[in-house]
Amino acid sequence: MGLIYLDACLVIYLAENHARWGEPLASAIAEVGEARFGISPLVKCECMVGPLKRGDPVLEQAYTQLFDQFAPLAMPEPVYLQAAQLRAHFGLRTPDALHLACAQYHGCDALWTNDDRLALASHGLARNILN
C-alpha cells in the first residue's frame, strides 16, 4: 500500500495514547510496513484544539513531533470543491467531506478512520481501521 490518509481521530489516539485505541492503532500502522501516512492541515487543526484548550504545552509539542512523521497533504481549492460535491451527494459534515476529498485529491490508497459514515461515501477508500 502506498499512501494512507489518517483521519484526525486516529492521530489523537496516537498522540494521547488512547486507553482503548492507542495500542491497536499502533499495531495496525506497524503491520502495513512500507506505506506512507499523510495528514492534512485540517487534521492538524482538529488535533491541536484539545491541547490548546487545556493549555498543555507538553501535549502541543507531542503533536508537533508526531505531525512531522507524516507526509503533509495540501488542501488547494479543488479539494474544497470536491468536498462540496461529497456533502451534497452523501450528506457528510464539512470536516468529513474535506478529509475524504483531500485523500481523493492526493490519490491515497486508503483513508483510515474510526468513523463508519465515511466508508459509505468513499466507495471503499475509507475504512474504519479499528472496527
Language model region names:
Residues 14, 72, 92, 111:
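Conserved SAM-binding loop
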Residues 10, 43, 79, 99, ...:
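Alpha-helix capping/helix-boundary segments
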Residues 32, 90, 106:
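Active-site charged/polar residues at nucleotide-handling catalytic sites that mediate phosphoryl
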Residues 1-39, 51-62, 130-131:
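Short, well-structured N-terminal submotif of metal-dependent ribonuclease cores
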Residues 17, 69-89:
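Acidic catalytic patch
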Residues 1-3, 27, 69, 100-131:
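Acidic, PIN/NYN-like endoribonuclease modules and their adjacent C-terminal/linker elements
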